[in-house]
Amino acid sequence: MTIYHFVGIKGSGMSALAQILHDKGFQVQGSDVDKYFFTQKALEEKQIPIMTFSADNIQEGLTIIAGNAFPDTHEEIERALELGLPVIRYHKFLGQLIDGYTSIAITGSHGKTSTTGLLSHVVGAIRPTSYLIGDGTGSGTKGAEYFALEACEYQRHFLAYKPTYAIMTNIDWDHPDYFKSVDDVFNAFETLGKQVKKAVFALGDDAELRKLTLDIPIIYFGFGEENEFQAKNVIKETTGTKFDVYHRGEFLGSFEIPAYGDHNVLNALSVIALCDYEGLPVEDVKKELKTFEGVKRRFSITEKANQVLVDDYAHHPSEIRATVNAARQKYPDKKVVAVFQPHTFTRTRTFLQGFADSLNLADEVYLCDIFGSAREKTGNLTIADLAHKTKGNHIIKEEHTEELLKYPEAVILFMGAGDVQKFQAAYEKVLDHEVLTEADLKKSAIN
């Protein structure tokens, strides 16, 4: 039996796919850079070997699954081609894997990971379900009927999939290094829609998605009256959100989610719509929606000292706005401080004013240096260009996160798609030191 070798195994999709193959009984290994990524924890728990990149890792008997961030000139891929080993790109392998399941591809400019996680949780509790989530989580469930997968639009990679269903959460202009306009993004989504076998579930409040023309049913969901599935009577509380759902004007039920913001209501509504279409019991869907704990790096909360620290993947103006609004719903009486690390120079330059406008919805803003990508390590702007447009003109360094101590009782949002987590980790060490120092002072006073 072949051994599957993943080039770039710490990538979020790659990590999840490696776990799926491992669960299905295949022998799996992979390689990547030495740097720690949150995705590797699950790999280590399953004892999947992780090596440092080297041509010497490539031996006879391997099937190479190559991450999309790595060109054919990468040393391991080059060696594999020299040896005549099978080399297949991540998205193409996944496209083949989902055949034979009732597959549900979740795509959209924003909300893919959260919706895939929610769908996997709900459907997986009702019927056996395999899943691949963009937070690095994957499961190759034995006897699975369903396969839920996050489908990324970047470079049109999702066109490798021919799923049974698709959920389209929204269309927005992102990845400006590849997509030239929102029309370009729309064309990619419509092309995917034409490959879907049974039905597309699309946000009907999104003007772009309303333009879809397909030969299969398009089931629209949203807040507007014209949607087939409509969320009404939304009640936002500090413990979560309640809402009623109507299907073609008929009351379907009252639902509750332990999540915040309109975007999470819409994510849940898409799952409710698909489950209804598939005939899954509505009472089971209600029950499972209540127990979803979220996905990694999406409004992940840590309470430390007297502050609330939130880790979030938000890296686009629309996502930052949604994250700030969610924080205000859950913590209405707290100051909101945004710590943001822009991801890629092209995106930062293209959406510079949009980033400023969204960040300025917070009470205070701190900016980290721009995080480049494997494809784009430098650019013709600096973080100062964005800082000049935001409240306070603050730029924060990993070595000096103690500046955030100025905001007792605040919610501090660490946002970004790069390695903004290192800023949170550094700040948590500062807080730990502060707590220890305070304890020492109290002890001295007693003595």
From Swiss-Prot:
One matching Pfam family: Mur_ligase
Enzyme class (EC, first level): ligase
Binding-site positions, ATP: 108-114
GO BP field: cell division; cell wall organization; peptidoglycan biosynthetic process; regulation of cell shape
GO cellular component term of the entry, any: cytoplasm
Catalysed reaction equations from the record: UDP-N-acetyl-alpha-D-muramate + L-alanine + ATP = UDP-N-acetyl-alpha-D-muramoyl-L-alanine + ADP + phosphate + H(+)
Subcellular localization: Cytoplasm
Keywords for this protein: ATP-binding, Cell cycle, Cell division, Cell shape, Cell wall biogenesis/degradation, Cytoplasm, Ligase, Nucleotide-binding, Peptidoglycan synthesis
EC number per UniProt: 6.3.2.8
GO terms, molecular function: ATP binding; UDP-N-acetylmuramate-L-alanine ligase activity
Keyword ATP-binding tagged: yes
Gene3D superfamilies in the record: Mur ligase, C-terminal domain, Mur-like, catalytic domain, NAD(P)-binding Rossmann-like Domain
Organism superkingdom: Bacteria
Pathway stated in the Swiss-Prot or TrEMBL entry: Cell wall biogenesis; peptidoglycan biosynthesis
Record-linked HAMAP family: MurC
PANTHER family on file: UDP-N-ACETYLMURAMATE--L-ALANINE LIGASE, UDP-N-ACETYLMURAMATE--L-ALANINE LIGASE-RELATED
Known function: Cell wall formation.
Family classification: Belongs to the MurCDEF family.
Name by which UniProt lists this protein: UDP-N-acetylmuramate--L-alanine ligase
Gene: murC
